[in-house]
């Protein structure tokens, strides 16, 4: 991974386009819209194990085929900010034993707005000595011009020197949106391609009538940008830090038609069908929503059979998938009632087999 095959990028993307086109062919999908990535420095987060060798230590990764570890001194797929931090950080950690003793992993989360969180993970409890040393480390990095947050983590322990989040700014069709991103919770890794996904989703849902339901909304990445196209938006998310970030993002972007509820897709299905009542829904009148459109961005496993049935009840379905094979499994059912109006390939993960796909489905007839 040290030297990227930048000159082969276009050919590698064309291969993905062929593969996804073939996968979607049985469902009569229209021609793919293809959204390319920058060829380097596109990844806004990275995680590395730390290997100790005598008094020395360094970042390592593991080869996916051979499982052999290899040393990483620079990482061209990661943002330039992460690369600069990797170079600056290790010499400073080496100055203080309490900071590198039993350190086994470092996670980096950066933003286009030049903020970064460094998370230091340890096989030991963290005490006041660690905290004092970490404060010194942060000051040293700030003196080098870094806008940095430091988080220490150990078993059942987390210490934030100031905060455990960064605020990213993403541009969508010329408008800037603020997104709070919390350390150790999911965020889209490729900021440039994320903006393109948001723009595509906004374009698909333009001129929509009624309301939008989103399952698993995370920090509100999609629902905040999509709210402009709907009367009201109802979004579900199960992870507490993501819900808190989403609530901040709603306020920061002055969105007044988006309601987030903390429940799983399965629980939401039960609530909609009146199978059971939830205290979390007190004060929210589900009957006041006329959701004609549903948005889903499921994990790699795709949607389970019950959720597919729920999704099928909606007139229009916007489906973003990080695994086209499980997308196609779901389309076996969805294509019985819906047709694909638009399809897209988003190259979130250049130089890998991974493909991010989007389909916009409309009910037949």
UniProtKB/Swiss-Prot annotation:
EC numbers, comma separated: 2.1.1.-, 2.1.1.35
Catalytic residue positions: 322 (nucleophile), 356 (proton acceptor)
Catalytic activity: uridine(54) in tRNA + S-adenosyl-L-methionine = 5-methyluridine(54) in tRNA + S-adenosyl-L-homocysteine + H(+); uridine(341) in tmRNA + S-adenosyl-L-methionine = 5-methyluridine(341) in tmRNA + S-adenosyl-L-homocysteine + H(+)
Cysteines paired by S-S bonds: none
Domain of life: Bacteria
GO cellular component: cytosol
CDD domains: AdoMet_MTases (cd02440)
Binding site for S-adenosyl-L-methionine: 188, 216, 221, 237, 297
GO molecular function term, any single one: rRNA binding
Keywords assigned by UniProt, alphabetized: Methyltransferase, S-adenosyl-L-methionine, Transferase, tRNA processing
A single BP term in Gene Ontology: tRNA methylation
Protein family per UniProt: Belongs to the class I-like SAM-binding methyltransferase superfamily. RNA M5U methyltransferase family. TrmA subfamily.
Function per UniProt: Dual-specificity methyltransferase that catalyzes the formation of 5-methyluridine at position 54 (m5U54) in all tRNAs, and that of position 341 (m5U341) in tmRNA (transfer-mRNA).
The protein, known as: tRNA/tmRNA (uracil-C(5))-methyltransferase
Name of the coding gene: trmA
């Amino acid at each position: 991974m040290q030297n990227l095959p930048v000159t082969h990028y276009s050919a590698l993307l064309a291969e993905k386009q062929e593969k996804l086109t073939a996968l979607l062919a049985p469902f009569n999908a229209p021609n793919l819209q293809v959204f390319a990535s920058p060829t380097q420095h596109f990844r806004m987060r990275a995680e590395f194990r730390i290997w100790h060798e005598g008094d020395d230590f360094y970042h390592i990764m593991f080869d996916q085929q051979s499982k052999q570890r290899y040393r990483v001194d620079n990482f061209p797929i990661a943002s330039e900010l992460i690369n600069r931090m990797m170079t600056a950080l290790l010499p400073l950690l080496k100055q203080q034993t309490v900071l590198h003793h039993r350190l086994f992993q470092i996670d980096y989360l950066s933003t286009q707005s030049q903020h970064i969180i460094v998370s230091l993970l340890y096989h030991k409890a963290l005490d006041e000595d660690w905290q004092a040393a970490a404060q010194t480390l942060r000051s040293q990095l700030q003196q080098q011009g870094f806008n940095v947050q430091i988080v220490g983590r150990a078993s059942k322990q987390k210490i934030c020197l100031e905060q455990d989040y960064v605020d990213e700014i993403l541009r969508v069709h010329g408008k800037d949106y603020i997104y709070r991103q919390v350390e150790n919770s999911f965020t889209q890794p490729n900021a440039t391609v994320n903006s393109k996904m948001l723009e595509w989703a906004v374009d698909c849902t333009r001129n929509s009538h009624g309301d939008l339901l989103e399952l698993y909304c995370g920090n509100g990445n999609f629902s905040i940008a999509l709210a402009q196209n709907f009367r009201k938006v109802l979004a579900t998310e199960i992870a507490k830090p993501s819900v808190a970030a989403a609530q901040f993002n709603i306020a920061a972007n002055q969105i007044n038609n988006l309601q987030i509820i903390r429940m799983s897709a399965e629980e939401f299905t039960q609530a909609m069908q009146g199978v059971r009542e939830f205290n979390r829904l007190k004060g929210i009148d589900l009957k006041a929503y006329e959701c004609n459109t549903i948005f889903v961005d499921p994990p790699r496993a795709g949607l389970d059979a019950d959720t597919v049935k729920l999704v099928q009840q909606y007139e229009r379905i916007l489906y973003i998938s990080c695994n086209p094979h499980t997308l196609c499994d779901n389309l076996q059912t969805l294509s019985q009632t819906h047709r694909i109006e638009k399809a897209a390939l988003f190259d979130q993960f250049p130089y890998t087999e991974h493909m991010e796909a989007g389909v916009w489905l409309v009910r037949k007839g």
